[in-house]
Amino acid sequence: MRISNPKFLLFLVTFWGILIAFAPDTLTNLIDYTVFSLLGVLGAIFANSTGAGGGVVFIPMFNKLGFTESQAIATSFAIQCFGMTAGALTWFYHYKLEREPSGLWPSFFPVIKVSAIASIIGLWAVYGLDLAPPSSLHYSFSWFSLLLGIGIIFIALVLKPQPLHQTVQPIDWLMICVISLFGGAVTAWLSVGIGELLAIYLIIRRFDVNMAVAVAVIVSALTVWSAIWQHTLVDFNVYWQVVLFAGPGAIFGGVLAKAIVAKLSAKRLKIFFAFWLMVIGAVGVSGG
């Protein structure tokens, strides 16, 4: 069933209403959190149209609101479970209905399988071994995003178009595994990383930019779902009042993102992706 199906939407609204009705807080207090619905929409639109996780929107905002680091990361993961899942399902249906029948994106599922497994291993290696993040990780990741954004704009505007790659070469499999292991670890620390790194690599290697985004979104969704148990069952730090409103907003944003991407040419999508990388980098560097 597609998430835009009226029956599914009715179920979602009903389920959300039940959660509010049984929430251990007064309706008056909960109303104060409705503004986070917009944050969920915004984060999911950028996340699911570029492949970079919504945490790049959520974490800076949560830091400004005085969340603890654990609360910010856990709440970001929880919201992304809504938004990235909506985006992943939307991209999956796009592949099944429009790409697979034409024989396009032959590497779609193989890349997702390998990358998701490696990413989850990297993420749970951090949790299982209790690995602390490098002190300069966030700052370095921000510079990396900024410079890569500039590089992708150069590729899109200056270099002549070349034929797209359809098949994954042995060196690509090696790089995808390494990038995904590292990206999973970074995601454990920052709640973002795997989608951005994977999309960047696939775009640079001249795979279809829409496929790069779709793969990154789906791998990100699988990664955040594997992570949420650490922040709920093991060590609960989710700011649930925020998720109660930002989560449904993120679902809407995740669906809307695909419609936005459909309006962009491959070149414009690359530029949009690069612009978002530079925004991420600039915000991180200025806050570093």
Model-inferred region functions:
Residues 40-51, 180-191:
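Transmembrane alpha-helix interface/packing and boundary motifs in multi-pass membrane proteins
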Residues 58-71, 197-211:
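Interfacial segments of multi-pass membrane proteins
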Residues 1-40, 63-65, 69-71, 88-184, ...:
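Juxtamembrane transmembrane-helix boundary motif
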Residues 45-55, 205-214, 262-267:
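Membrane-helix interface "capping/anchor" motifs
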Residues 79-81, 217-232, 241-250:
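A small-residue-rich subset of transmembrane alpha-helices
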Residues 68-78, 101-107, 206-218:
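Membrane-interface alpha-helices at helix entry/exit sites of multi-pass transporters
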Residues 50-58, 190-199:
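Transmembrane helix boundary and interhelical junction motifs in multipass membrane proteins
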Residues 77-87, 113-121, 125, 218-226:
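Membrane-embedded alpha-helical segments of transport systems
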